[in-house]
Amino acid sequence: MVLQAIGKHALGVVLLLFVVFLWLISSFLTSSLLDDDNFFSPFLITYINTGTFVFYLIPWYFSEKKTRKHRLMSELSMYESVHDSSFNLGTRPNSPLGFRQTAYLSLGFCIIWFAANYFSNSSLGFTNVASFTIISSMSGFFTLGLGTIVNVERFTLSKLLALMASVGGVIIVVTQDAKQADLNDSPPSRPALGNAYALLAALLYGCYSVMVKFHITEESCVSTRLFFGLVGLFDLILLWPFLIILHLYGVERFSLPSTTAGLIVLIINASITFVSDYLWVIAMLMTSPLLVTVGMSLSIPLALFFDILLKGHYLNFSLILGSLLVFAGFIVVNYNQQNII
């Protein structure tokens, strides 16, 4: 049983590392879209990306159709066993969530997840990447704090120190890398607003990570396809009026990219989100909200590696130290999580 849990945790870490790579690519694509002065539409980008989740309802429907009879018999057996034994009100049941329960969870997740991604995308339009990255890394503190309150994370001093090391490494890498940036880059238009958006996105990221783990203790407790499919459905049904409102008030234009290249980037970015966020939830359920939050900081030294290859940025001691701190923070949190297993 212990070996099985360790194996599941290891698989979750592998999935997380793959998600980090996908999100890194997505961030570059999103940045390229927002750099287009004729297409500054963070809400539309988030709406399209989230809306793609509705396609998960297709495989869920056919799978549900095949297994409905067997599932109903299993639920009946579980119902009878519960009434034949004592029921502990102090524990949360691990039985699979039904359609209605999953729908309620998907609705709450859709709103918080959409808001987090919208504020994250919007902040890039008002502040510089360095400030955005540093502030976003603070989501680990929100995740640890909220997770401890609702008992999905166990607070330890080593976790706090690992988190501080990771954030410290992020600050070192980002500030050093910013010194090598092109001096011709235009300054941020509204840095205070952009930084506030980034901080709000970090808080919301911690909220939805903890919320999902609190309601779904293991990946077997919910149909992930149904969960994400309903998130996409709620996104398409409930949020489209805001596209028109934002357009009418001049906040952002309701239009697609004007170039073929822009459309291709938009589609590829949505496809990456379609896969990566599904795998992110599975990785989080196999590990912990804090581990996936700290794990996302690994994208920063990875992005630095790409900058060295593609833009000719050079390594120095500070960049190496910062990267090592980020990796060390991830390793310590992962070690703590394995000890809990």
UniProtKB/Swiss-Prot annotation:
GO cellular component: fungal-type vacuole membrane; Golgi apparatus; Golgi membrane
SUPFAM superfamilies: Multidrug resistance efflux transporter EmrE (SSF103481)
Domain of life of the organism encoding this protein: Eukaryota
Alphabetically ordered keywords of this record: Golgi apparatus, Membrane, Transmembrane, Transmembrane helix, Vacuole
One term of GO molecular function: transmembrane transporter activity
TM region positions: 10-30, 42-62, 107-127, 129-149, 155-175, 192-212, 226-246, 263-283, 290-310, 313-333
Coiled coil: none
Protein known as: Uncharacterized transporter C405.03c
Family note: Belongs to the TPT transporter family.
Broad class of where this protein is predominantly found: membrane
Disulfide bonds: none
Annotated membrane topology: Multi-pass membrane protein
Subcellular location: Vacuole membrane; Golgi apparatus membrane
